[in-house]
Structure formats: structure tokens, C-alpha cells
Amino acid sequence: MMTGHLGVSSLGTELLDDPAADPAVVTRSLHNVARANRWFGGAAAVRYGLGLLLRDLPRGQPITLLDLGTGAGDLPRRAVGWARRRGHLLRPLGLELSRPAAALAASAGVPCAVACAGAPPLKQRSVDIVLVSQVAHHFTRESAIRLVRTCDALARLGVVVADLRRGRLASLAFRVGSTALGFDPITKADGLTSIRRGYTTGELRELLLVAGVRARVSRRPGYRLVATWRTVS
């Protein structure tokens, strides 16, 4: 995950907060995160958000999708196939501070720059859609607000922010699911910390308002929140 110039949340610690973490451990953890995205609602949340933005767009035209904090690149990679079946041509790009993560994303077919979300090497309105999934909760409130504003400035068409909805049942469900899938102890601990760092619906709405965007916030299966908005070019 990209920390860079953004302040990391003081609520617990996660392996992926540290860009200097052991590459082998990062790789294993990101593979488990990708499995969690598939089975616990992360990929479905992204599809939902993208669907809201793509539904009014003409089919067949290339659409650039920038995934900030792309991890292993599994979410944009899956989104490309999903969109293709609906007549949309997504062109994915990733941004990651972690070099091992960037390498994984590139190997999955997602071109990935090594950079931080606080200072992305991109011009304003340089991509069509910006995706930021399960990234905002890693940061302080002030930095998450800054991240939202960065997304809004980069996107020509719209933004999808997907994150975790905090709750006791979410933690219980993750404990059961991560055990069933055989996640390692580090991934389990990081997942529980991520849930603790997650948002309520009201918290995410308030954060977006402070950031200056008028977004639609939806609750989705798997204790997910998805915010979408169209940008003003």
C-alpha cells in the first residue's frame, strides 16, 4: 500500500504499511489479499462502483483505469475482463509504493509505477477513472481527505472509493473466512486491523464532504462501502 507523503493511521499496524517490509512476506500477504478480494466481497464492490460509472458511457471506447495502491493488481485485472464482457475496454494502470507489489501487478498484466499517492507522477485529468480500494483506511483522516482530493483531481470521468465497513460481525466473519482459506497469521492480523481501521457509512460520507466531493455511498455485501462520483472537468 502507498504511504509516502501520507500519514499512516495510528490505530494498529499492518505489514503493508511498511514499504521496506520483507518482499517474500509482502508477496505472500498480497496473494492472500487477492483471495480475500475474490471471496469476501472486495472484487464485487469494485465491480459495483465501476458499473455505476460505466453504465452511461458508450461501449467500445478505451477507458483508462488508475488503481492507486493496486497491491498485486488483482482488482484492475479482474475488472478488465468483467468490463470486456459488457462491451467496455478498460486500460488498467497501477500505482504502488511497494516495489514487490508493483512487480506482482506488472506480472499480472497491470503496468505499475512505483510512486506514492501523496505525490502521484501524473497530471490533473490525465486518466478516465481512478480506483482506490481498501487503501484510505490505512491513513490518518487528514491524509485520507487529501487522497480523495487527489483522486478527484486526476480523474476525467469519475472515482470509485471502496473500503471496509467497521463492525464486530465483520471481524467475526473475517476470522472464520480467513481460517477456512488457510491465511497465514500475518495476513489474519492485518485483516483484523484493517477492519478496525474501517469506516461507518456516516464516517465515510462525512470524510468525502470535507474533501469537497458529492459522492454516492453504498453498503455492499462483505461489510463493504463503495463511494462513487463523477468529476467536473
Where do the model's predicted regions map?
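N-terminal auxiliary segments of SAM/dcSAM-dependent transferases
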Residues: 1-19
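Class I SAM-dependent methyltransferase Rossmann-like catalytic core
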Residues: 23-49, 53-54
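Class I SAM-dependent methyltransferase SAM/SAH-binding core
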Residues: 66-68, 72-119
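A conserved beta-strand element that flanks and buttresses the S-adenosyl-L-methionine
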Residues: 131
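A short, conserved alpha-helix within the catalytic core of class I
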Residues: 139-151
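Conserved beta-strand signature within the Rossmann-like core of class I S-adenosyl-L-methionine
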Residues: 155-164
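C-terminal alpha-helical "lid/dimerization" subdomain adjacent to the S-adenosyl-L-methionine
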Residues: 164-208, 217
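Core SAM-dependent methyltransferase catalytic element
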Residues: 215-233
